[in-house]
Amino acid sequence: MSAPVLQLAPIIARIEAAGLYRSVAGARDMARVAREGAAGSPIAFVMPGSEEPRPSGVAGGVQHSAVTARFMVITLAEDLRRDAGGRALSQLEEVRAQLLPLLEGWGPDYASGPVAHQRGQLVTGPLRGGLIGWQDDFTLRFRRRITTGA
């Protein structure tokens, strides 16, 4: 199967179905939570990162490319103010221990290979309400077919 761009819906659906998080959302909701804080945790935000296409040629007016796409899952837990971080850190560890095998090696229908975990890092941006965050970066590959100028 071919996809013109990275499609996050099947990734979000897989994470939601596993029941690891109180909620799973996208970039717009992440900005709101960063400004206002959150009620309950853990919560996840699935966002696109980048795409790196490698064109493999044009045939019959169709550009073919192999694309390596990056996406991130940001996990937020709370509340650092209440417990000096112990509960929040435990939540991050527990959720990540289930998230990584959930995505690693799996691939949505449009992918030409499995999801691979690339790295993880602490989210250091301003988070309100005592939230602590962890960002896991993943890659997946897919084929892109785009009809060129008609």
Regions found by a protein language model. Give the residues of each.
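Charged, amphipathic alpha-helical segments and their flanking helix caps
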Residues: 1-41, 45-150
